[in-house]
């Protein structure tokens, strides 16, 4: 049922259940700001899972081989490598601090034994090589094993260095640093399907880079007006098409998505397609423009659809139909009546991400109170689940949660007034081939999988 591609009925139902697998991170009540997870990303095979945090660290988990001796063993994720990707900096020209927080991580397809990933903070993108060493050279002529020079008068024979086995060591080394190309904060990076180029987007510009060239990039989108007082929208997310290397999309704070073709011109100021849903005038309010701002855009694996996340909903668009989305899934419609208080505590500006499962049949996104939502596109069923340590026994099934908006509250329901808005799930990731999901809840990383009966 859950087969390759993470299909089945992942949004719930009698024949499909999600169960707890692992949780990573400290249990502390007082969470240090630096430990808060800011991005989560599986690699192309799903064997590696990377997280970045506000302290500039990247932690990579590797999936262990399945244990045939243990019943229901699916292969757990354990720490593979941890390294400091970015450090805090200071821009002396603008008197601005540059945070070390990792905004995005993107894996490159594996070409050899090593793994490569891109990580970015607000200003600088880095290409990292993750490689293993289990052998070391011994028997040098001029140096001892500890690196000291040998006495030339004691060298009586020529030695041929040999490789000796050693304990496995995982090294993370920065291979490229792409800097000084963004005036504003970088919100997106996306690797092209040609595996040679990638884009980076900030509030007003999108740049195209070659992975081998660090000292120059091409500006492919520039929406900065001559007079900044005329600025009406900013770029919120951007992504390359998974198969067509000339096509990319970017979303805006006005709730629109532009699809651009780099073959048409060097500067993609004119879009090839423009996706926008007409607004219902009767529902317009002070908050309409804020909640329509798109916080994430993701192409489906097939390249036929794209998904956008705004504050209250997830929309699925057919690339051949610009006028309206083919699907709209309400994530937490019960918050519409709370927009005023959410505006006052700044939660209305939270940027939720979204992701597809491997077969594009289901989508997942986060909410408040450590809830996350799943929508099955085939059955139209949806479910609300919770990432909580209270339900963290191995293979414990996740019980669907319900939020009630008023009137009598049933035993298993939670009132909208008692939701904890400090507990929010902004970042989630779905294994590219199996029903395994990773959910970041503050400083904890939860891993869930489909239950094998």
Swiss-Prot record:
Sites of Phosphothreonine modification: 308
Null allele phenotype: Mice are viable and were born at the expected Mendelian ratio. Mitotic cells display increased chromosome scattering, associated with in the presence of enhanced phosphorylation and perichromosomal loading of Mki67.
Gene Ontology molecular function: any one: enzyme-substrate adaptor activity
Alphabetical GO biological process terms: cell division; exit from mitosis; mitotic cell cycle; regulation of chromosome segregation
Disulphide linkage map: none
Keyword Oxidoreductase appears in the UniProt entry: no
Family assignment from sequence similarity: Belongs to the phosphatase 2A regulatory subunit B family.
Lineage: Eukaryota, Metazoa, Chordata, Craniata, Vertebrata
InterPro entries per the UniProt record, alphabetical: PP2A_PR55 (IPR000009), PP2A_PR55_CS (IPR018067), WD40/YVTN_repeat-like_dom_sf (IPR015943), WD40_repeat_dom_sf (IPR036322), WD40_rpt (IPR001680)
Gene name as annotated: Ppp2r2d
Subcellular location: Cytoplasm
Role description: Substrate-recognition subunit of protein phosphatase 2A (PP2A) that plays a key role in cell cycle by controlling mitosis entry and exit. Involved in chromosome clustering during late mitosis by mediating dephosphorylation of MKI67. The activity of PP2A complexes containing PPP2R2D (PR55-delta) fluctuate during the cell cycle: the activity is high in interphase and low in mitosis.
Sites bearing Phosphoserine, chain numbering: 285
Top-rank taxon, per record: Eukaryota
Keywords on record: Cell cycle, Cell division, Cytoplasm, Mitosis, Phosphoprotein, Repeat, WD repeat
Complex formation: PP2A consists of a common heterodimeric core enzyme, composed of a 36 kDa catalytic subunit (subunit C) and a 65 kDa constant regulatory subunit (PR65 or subunit A), that associates with a variety of regulatory subunits. Proteins that associate with the core dimer include three families of regulatory subunits B (the R2/B/PR55/B55, R3/B''/PR72/PR130/PR59 and R5/B'/B56 families), the 48 kDa variable regulatory subunit, viral proteins, and cell signaling molecules. Interacts with IER5.
Presence of keyword Nucleus: no
Protein name stated in the entry: Serine/threonine-protein phosphatase 2A 55 kDa regulatory subunit B delta isoform
Native source species: Mus musculus
Spans of repeat WD: 32-71, 97-138, 181-219, 230-270, 289-327, 344-385, 420-452
């Amino acid at each position: 049922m859950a087969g390759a591609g993470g299909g089945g009925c992942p949004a719930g139902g009698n024949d499909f259940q999600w169960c707890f697998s692992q949780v990573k991170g400290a249990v502390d009540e007082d969470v240090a700001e630096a430990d808060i997870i800011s991005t989560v990303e599986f690699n192309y095979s799903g064997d590696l899972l990377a997280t970045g945090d506000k302290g500039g660290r990247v932690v990579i988990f590797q999936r262990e081989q399945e244990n045939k001796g243990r019943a229901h063993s699916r292969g757990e994720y354990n720490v593979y490598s941890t390294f400091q990707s970015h450090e805090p900096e200071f821009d002396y020209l603008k008197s601005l601090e540059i945070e070390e927080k990792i905004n995005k991580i993107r894996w490159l397809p594996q070409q050899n034994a090593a793994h490569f990933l891109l990580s970015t903070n607000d200003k600088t993108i880095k290409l990292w090589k993750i490689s293993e060493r289990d052998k070391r050279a011994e028997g040098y002529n001029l140096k001892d094993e500890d690196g000291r020079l040998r006495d030339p008068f004691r060298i009586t024979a020529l030695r041929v260095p040999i490789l000796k086995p050693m304990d496995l060591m995982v090294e993370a080394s920065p291979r490229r640093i792409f800097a000084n190309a963004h005036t504003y904060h970088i919100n997106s990076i996306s690797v092209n399907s040609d595996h040679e180029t990638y884009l980076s987007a900030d509030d007003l510009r999108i740049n195209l880079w070659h992975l081998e060239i660090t000292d120059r990039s091409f500006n492919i989108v520039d929406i900065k007006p001559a007079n900044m007082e005329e600025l009406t929208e900013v770029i919120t997310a951007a992504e390359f098409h998974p198969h067509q290397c000339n096509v990319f999309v970017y979303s805006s704070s006005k709730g629109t998505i532009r699809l651009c073709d780099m073959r048409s011109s060097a500067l993609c100021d004119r879009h090839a397609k423009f996706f926008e849903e007409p607004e219902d005038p009767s529902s317009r309010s002070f908050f309409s423009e804020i909640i329509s701002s798109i916080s994430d855009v993701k192409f489906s694996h097939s390249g036929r659809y794209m998904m956008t996340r705004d504050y209250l909903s997830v929309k699925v668009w057919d690339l051949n139909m610009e006028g309206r989305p083919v699907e709209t899934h309400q994530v937490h419609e019960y918050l519409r009546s709370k927009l005023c208080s959410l505006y006052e505590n700044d939660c209305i500006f939270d940027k939720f991400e979204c992701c597809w499962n491997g077969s594009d049949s289901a989508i997942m996104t986060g909410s408040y109170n450590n809830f996350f939502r799943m929508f099955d596109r085939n059955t139209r069923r949806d479910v609300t689940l919770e990432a909580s340590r209270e339900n963290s026994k191995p293979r414990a099934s996740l019980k669907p949660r319900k939020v009630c908006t008023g009137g009598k509250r049933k035993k298993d329901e939670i009132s909208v007034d008692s939701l904890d808005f400090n507990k929010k799930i902004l970042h989630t990731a779905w294994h590219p081939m199996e029903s395994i999901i990773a959910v970041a809840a503050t400083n904890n990383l939860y891993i869930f999988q489909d239950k094998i009966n």
